[in-house]
A protein has these predicted regions:
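Active-site core of glycosidic bond-cleaving carbohydrate-active enzymes
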Residues: 1-135, 145, 171
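Non-catalytic C-terminal accessory modules of carbohydrate-active enzymes
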Residues: 83-228
C-alpha cells in the first residue's frame, strides 16, 4: 500500500480515519500515477485496507467520521474502481443522515456538512468525470446500477451534462457547452456505435477504442447516443 510517512521511523495506521496519502486522487489522477499501474495498485490497496480495518462492521459501530469515507470514495472513483467506490458510498448514504435530512459528522450525531457535499460528489464522480477537454461517462459504474439517469452535472470547460441515461450497453448523453469547443468523450468500454442526434454543428470523429472527439457548438443542446460492444 502507498505509505503515509516518508520516514521509515513511522508506521502506517490503517485503523485511522485519516488518509492524507490519498490526496493526489481526491480530484482526478495525476499523469505520473496514470502511467504507473503498480502505483495505482498501491493506492487501491490502501483504500481496501482502510475499509477492512477502520470501516469494518460499519452497520453496528458509531464514532466513525463521514469525511474519511468521502476521501476514500473520491480516491476510488479517480482510480475508476467502481465496486470500491460503491463500498464507500453505501455507508455514506445510510449512516450519516437524520430523518430531517440534516447530515452528521459521526453516526447520527454532531451536525456537520462535510457529507452534504461529499456524498453527492462521490456519486456524481462515479457517473460523470471531467478534466479540461475531457468528459468521461460512467467512469466508475458499479454492478448495482445496471440502468439509471442523472441530470444537471456541471463539467470543466463550461460544459453541462444535462441528462445522462444508461441501460446495459446503451448510453445517451445530452450535453450543452457555453463555448464552441472540441472535447474527448470517453465511454466506460469499447464503443460499437455512436451518433449525434441533434445539435447543429456537432460532430464526432475517431479517437480511440473507447473514446471519440466531439465538436460542441456554443449554447446548443447536443444528444449523443453510444452503444458499447
Amino acid at each position: 500500500a502507498i505509505k503515509e510517512w516518508l520516514s521509515p521511523k513511522f508506521e502506517d495506521n490503517y485503523n485511522h480515519r485519516h488518509s492524507s496519502q490519498l490526496y493526489p486522487l481526491f480530484d482526478g489522477m495525476p499523469k505520473e500515477i496514470q502511467a504507473d499501474p503498480k502505483l495505482q495498485g498501491a493506492f487501491r490497496k490502501l483504500i481496501e485496507l482502510k475499509l477492512d480495518r477502520h470501516w469494518t462492521n460499519w452497520e453496528k459501530q458509531g464514532g466513525f467520521m463521514s469525511f474519511g469515507l468521502v476521501q476514500l470514495g473520491q480516491a476510488a472513483t479517480s482510480l475508476g474502481d467502481a465496486e470500491l467506490a460503491y463500498r464507500c458510498l453505501v455507508p455514506l448514504v445510510n449512516r450519516y443522515w437524520l430523518s430531517n435530512l440534516a447530515s452528521t459528522h459521526n453516526y447520527r450525531s454532531l451536525f456537520n456538512t462535510d457529507i452534504s457535499g461529499g456524498m453527492p460528489a462521490v456519486l456524481i464522480k462515479m457517473l460523470v468525470a471531467s478534466d479540461p477537454g475531457i468528459v468521461s461517462l460512467l467512469p466508475a459504474l458499479p454492478k448495482a446500477w445496471p440502468s439509471g439517469t442523472i441530470e444537471g452535472v456541471l463539467c470543466r470547460g463550461q460544459i453541462e451534462v444535462e441528462r445522462l441515461h444508461w441501460d446495459g450497453k446503451a448510453i445517451q448523453a445530452v450535453l450543452r457547452s457555453s463555448v464552441r469547443q472540441e472535447v474527448r468523450l470517453v465511454a466506460p468500454g469499447p464503443i460499437q456505435a455512436i451518433s449525434v442526434g441533434n445539435g447543429s454543428g456537432a460532430a464526432v470523429r475517431p479517437d480511440g477504442p473507447a473514446s471519440r472527439k466531439l465538436s460542441l457548438p456554443a449554447g446548443v443542446e447536443v444528444t449523443v447516443d453510444v452503444t458499447l460492444k
